């Protein structure tokens, strides 16, 4: 991989808007690499994990309580057999068809996917870049629980199904948008990695996390996609590098110095052509006080901090992407509008400077 993104502007999936057409307008007008918007306004089915639950055996959505869990009781061997048959038919490296429609996301679960597809089809020309996204298998399996409120991660049978389901959902999205973009980025969002190593998840092994993430990354590569991982807090960034992600996305406004603590991993990542997505645009009320100039200064500071470890500043520049620090789904709409405007302005200003 030798792609030079040089401050390409993109974003995390969630948006606070109630008008899907407006969300698409913002995405296409403010971002070099547009996204399909995840719109929680439309209800439970566009919530971060539930949005990716269709087709997974034993998922139970409780509309009244506003949550989802998995039923692991009784005999589920037939349901798993159907799942694995669909998985192998699609994903077998020698004879797989690549057809991942068994894990499709319907319009009921994503207004944004279908609204963006319709707009791009009407536009009739390919975009240079497009970004899709999936909740990562670690966050999915550690957040969702069984009937005993035990996280699914600790059930190895269900964990494997979830990893493979997320892999297929990534491929399905890439395949869906391939006719409309030259390059597709697929983010595997792993917010829970900010708690990795804490007492809550002390029994979660690093090797298992790396292996789970790598399995999804490899699926993204099957369809020629670039695999990124977003984590909005601090984490052990070397995990993402060891998992083989192409893009490491982090909060460069609050935690921008933390990547330099993993200088050897960052050097390895950039050396193999990997990209760093600097989430320098805050998705907190702090956005109200920020200007393009203040955010460019913050970006320069954290890039220089990484360069001080011995990594070429020119390499950092050429392999940089600009994003918000997290999704904007929980923000006031006016604040979210400013976030996307700042992505555009900072991206433009940094390209002009370098």
What are these regions (language model features)?
Residues 31-35, 125-130, 180-184, 222-227, ...:
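Short, well-ordered coil/turn segments that N-cap beta-strands
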Residues 109-126, 166-182, 263-269, 296-314:
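Short amphipathic alpha-helices and their capping/turn segments at secondary-structure boundaries
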């Amino acid at each position: 991989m030798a792609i030079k993104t040089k401050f390409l502007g993109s974003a995390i999936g969630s948006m606070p808007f109630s008008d899907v057409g407006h969300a698409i307008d913002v995405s296409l007008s403010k971002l070099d690499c547009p996204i399909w918007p995840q719109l929680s306004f439309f209800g439970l089915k566009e919530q971060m994990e539930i949005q990716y639950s269709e087709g997974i055996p034993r998922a139970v959505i409780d509309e009244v309580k506003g949550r989802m869990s998995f039923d692991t009781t009784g005999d589920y061997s037939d349901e798993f057999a159907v799942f694995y048959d669909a998985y192998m038919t699609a994903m077998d490296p020698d004879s797989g068809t690549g057809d991942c429609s068994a894990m499709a996301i319907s319009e009921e679960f994503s207004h944004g996917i279908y609204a963006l597809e319709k707009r791009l089809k009407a536009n009739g020309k390919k975009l240079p870049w497009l970004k899709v996204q999936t909740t990562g298998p670690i966050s999915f399996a550690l957040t969702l629980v069984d009937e005993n409120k035990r996280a699914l991660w600790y059930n190895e049978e269900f964990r494997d199904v979830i990893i493979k389901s997320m892999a297929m959902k990534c491929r399905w999205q890439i395949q869906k948008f391939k006719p409309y973009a030259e390059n597709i980025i697929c983010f595997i969002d792993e917010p829970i990695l900010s708690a990795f190593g804490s007492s809550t998840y002390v029994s979660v092994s690093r090797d298992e996390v790396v292996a789970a993430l790598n399995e999804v990354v490899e699926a993204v590569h099957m369809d020629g996609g670039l695999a990124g991982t977003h984590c909005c807090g601090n984490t052990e960034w070397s995990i993402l590098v060891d998992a083989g992600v192409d893009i490491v996305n982090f909060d460069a406004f609050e935690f921008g110095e933390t990547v330099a603590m993993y200088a050897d991993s960052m050097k390895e990542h950039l050396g193999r052509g990997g990209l760093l997505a600097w989430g320098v645009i805050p998705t907190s009320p702090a956005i109200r006080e920020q200007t393009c100039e203040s955010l460019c200064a913050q970006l320069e500071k954290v890039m220089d901090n990484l360069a001080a470890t011995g990594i070429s500043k020119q390499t950092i520049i050429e392999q940089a992407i600009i994003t918000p620090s997290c999704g904007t789904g929980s923000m006031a709409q006016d604040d979210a509008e400013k976030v996307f405007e700042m992505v555009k302005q900072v991206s433009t200003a940094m390209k002009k400077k370098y």
